[in-house]
């Protein structure tokens, strides 16, 4: 897809502050220090006349820039940098007077309907819609944005964000707040404004243990954990033929999966939530689609929200990351490749979700620590990005809700995405990105149990 960069703007908060802002990373922030940035894109379809170049540059873009400046007053951290100076024991988020957020403005002549669709599309065609986020060994930006015009068709907003500054809930609040401000010209009343990391109460010593784990998360630099440099990502080139697809799973199909779990399990009182059965179905289809050695190690994870699980609970207005990985690593592929693979996964996830009510941060951390330290080369990994509680379609900037959203970072981070459906009638929406051969097998297996 041909892309022309029109300009790169530096957007500053509407209300300037001369005081520096320095926020040390919390235990939860540190866990995501070595994860490659989260990338999302929101597609907005417009009429031919409202998406002309004249209208876009005279009306739409100025409104987006003006509202972004207003909302950055309350999301000032997004204009700052991640820093790790040699004298500091851990990294900090630092915002200085005059710091700004990078906003790239671009155009493309690509077919908007196809690019923003839900069907199979080449991964490479969508990559240009995501802005770069420069990260070096001792410093890095935390958020960058890109607005791309499809003349006479629509536009999209691409975001790239470092996970240390936000999780799914914080990202959702920012997107909604920016959209609300653009549409109505007013700032929402409730915003995540608490930056004080002391409200995150975790057992003493966990932060240091997390820092000691960092070298294990950077495969090319085991001896040096003191770097912000990210591990290498999976390269995507044309010959790999990596495809992505968005699948909407209806409430009826969710019920099919729940009934299947009840029928195949000998255990009573399973926690059969939409999240559990969807994750179990995707995971088992992924393992089978990979085929290969049945004795290969596998590892799957989801992020649990600990805001209400700490004592005392974290304020609802907390600005930052407050999720911890629930890790499942003591398994081989063969345990999920057979007909009982689905129910095996359901039981594992069900037990995990039920334990969350009583399981503390420290015991959850110990499992993740062991899984990370013992992870072997060639392990098949899958992480769910998001959940069926995260809604990405309530972001109306004044030109209607997005017709589609994509989490673009799922391929390189060994993830699949999960969120609420756009139509709001229940069920769930998932995003998958795989090489064509695996994708063909995955879809065949996926639809076998729930229908098209």
From Swiss-Prot:
<keyword id="KW-0012">Acyltransferase</keyword>
<feature type="active site" description="Proton acceptor">
    <location>
        <position position="163"/>
    </location>
</feature>
<feature type="active site" description="Proton acceptor">
    <location>
        <position position="396"/>
    </location>
</feature>
<comment type="similarity">
    <text>Belongs to the plant acyltransferase family.</text>
</comment>
<comment type="function">
    <text>Involved in the biosynthesis of hydroxycinnamic acid amides, which play a role in defense against pathogens. Agmatine is the preferred acyl acceptor, lower activity is observed towards putrescine. The preferred acyl donor is p-coumaroyl-CoA, lower activity is seen towards feruloyl-CoA.</text>
</comment>
<keyword id="KW-0808">Transferase</keyword>
<dbReference type="InterPro" id="IPR023213">
    <property type="entry name" value="CAT-like_dom_sf"/>
</dbReference>
<dbReference type="Pfam" id="PF02458">
    <property type="entry name" value="Transferase"/>
</dbReference>
<dbReference type="GO" id="GO:0047634">
    <property type="term" value="F:agmatine N4-coumaroyltransferase activity"/>
</dbReference>
<dbReference type="InterPro" id="IPR051504">
    <property type="entry name" value="Plant_metabolite_acyltrans"/>
</dbReference>
<protein>
    <recommendedName>
        <fullName>Agmatine coumaroyltransferase</fullName>
        <ecNumber>2.3.1.64</ecNumber>
    </recommendedName>
</protein>
